[in-house]
């Protein structure tokens, strides 16, 4: 009889344990489903590598990415109302100006970069161009050079900022307009990475790109002084002299983008269809041993730890992300 009683007690606790296990919160379950991300074109190669690594860890998740200029990515959310979980911008200010507060609550700064002038062995004056004469070569007849659309892609307005700053740095009045006079409108492309194929096929001699893009595509490039390359935060007061007007939130509206060091931002869209899996990806991406390592390996310096400007913003982050972020303006 005692044995029978023990068996019944054991069975009772076994059933209780089963119920407890089945009633565990969903947080303990692996994320699954589709995660949609709109991101800057310059992040295509590192995000491709992250996608493979993340999906290997979480086979139930399908990360679907759309690359474009950063403003274009934001407008897919604001104007086209396309379903989206995560938006990553080559300029964190695009998130601040176009997505917060209506479409996003916070903005994590995760990496930096700098502008370089890219070329190949096929480029005219490839053996001659350097950091001291590049602005003269871009004015030469027959030289084909371009940049991305400032209204769609931060690399586009940053390229114009570099030219404005070069005029001041080299003390050459009128240099900005003279260089632009040798760049036809058709050499302005929707996103900076589209210029890479034009360089590689010999259809363009020079193009403004981020250093990380140049490294990832094995392009030759001219490195510029810190005073004009938008790559050193200590030079932000000098960079702020450059201002470019671009299209704003609504048709007919414009906003001024002021020169500053190149800083990338990422956010979770408020009505994210798959918030759980999106946060899992962000937790992986912002980890120094995860996505940030891939960025570093591909020539783009990450912030370790990543940053938000205020404690108030940090407190709005999902709990899993707060440990990966510091408060630093």
Swiss-Prot record:
Q: Which UniProt keywords apply?
A: Signal
Keyword Zinc, does the record have it?
Answer: no
Respond yes or no to whether keyword Signal is given for this record.
Answer: yes
* UniProt protein name: Uncharacterized solute-binding protein SYNAS_25580
Report the coiled-coil segments: none
**Signal peptide feature range:** 1-29
Pfam families found in the cross-reference section: SBP_bac_11 (PF13531)
GO MF term set: molybdate ion binding; tungstate binding
Instruction: Please name the PANTHER family in this protein's record.
Output: MOLYBDATE-BINDING PERIPLASMIC PROTEIN, MOLYBDATE_TUNGSTATE-BINDING PROTEIN WTPA
Please give the superkingdom of this protein's source. Answer: Bacteria
Q: What processes does the entry annotate via GO biological process terms?
A: molybdate ion transport
Family recorded in the similarity comment: Belongs to the bacterial solute-binding protein 1 family. WtpA subfamily.
InterPro entries from the UniProt entry: ABC_trnspt_W-bd_WtpA, ModA/WtpA
């Amino acid at each position: 009889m005692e044995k029978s009683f023990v068996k019944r007690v054991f069975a009772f606790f076994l059933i209780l344990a089963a119920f407890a296990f089945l009633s565990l919160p969903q947080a303990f379950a692996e994320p699954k489903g589709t995660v949609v991300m709109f991101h800057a074109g310059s992040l295509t190669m590192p995000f491709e590598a992250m996608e493979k690594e993340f999906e290997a860890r979480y086979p139930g998740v399908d990360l679907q990415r759309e690359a474009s200029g950063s403003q274009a990515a934001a407008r897919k959310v604001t104007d086209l109302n396309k379903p989206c979980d995560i938006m990553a911008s080559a300029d964190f200010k695009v998130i601040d100006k176009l997505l917060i507060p209506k479409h996003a609550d916070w903005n994590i700064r995760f990496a930096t970069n700098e502008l370089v002038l890219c070329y190949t062995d096929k480029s005219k004056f490839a053996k001659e161009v350097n950091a001291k004469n590049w602005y003269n070569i871009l004015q030469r007849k027959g030289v084909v050079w371009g940049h991305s659309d400032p209204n769609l892609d931060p690399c586009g307005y940053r390229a114009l900022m570099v030219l404005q700053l070069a005029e001041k740095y080299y003390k050459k009045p009128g240099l900005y307009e003279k260089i632009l006079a040798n760049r036809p409108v058709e050499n302005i492309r929707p996103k900076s990475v589209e210029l890479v194929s034009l360089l590689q096929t010999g259809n363009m001699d020079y193009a403004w790109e981020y250093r990380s893009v140049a490294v990832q595509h094995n392009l030759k490039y001219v490195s510029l002084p810190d005073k004009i390359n938008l790559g050193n935060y200590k030079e932000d007061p000098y960079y702020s002299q450059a201002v470019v007007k671009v299209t704003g939130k609504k048709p007919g509206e414009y906003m001024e983008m002021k020169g500053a060091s190149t800083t990338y931002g990422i956010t979770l869209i408020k009505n994210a269809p798959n918030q759980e899996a999106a946060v899992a990806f962000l937790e992986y991406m912002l980890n120094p041993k995860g996505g940030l390592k891939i960025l570093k390996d591909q020539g783009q310096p990450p912030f370790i730890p990543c940053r938000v400007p205020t404690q108030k913003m940090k407190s709005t982050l999902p709990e899993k992300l707060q440990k990966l972020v510091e408060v630093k303006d």
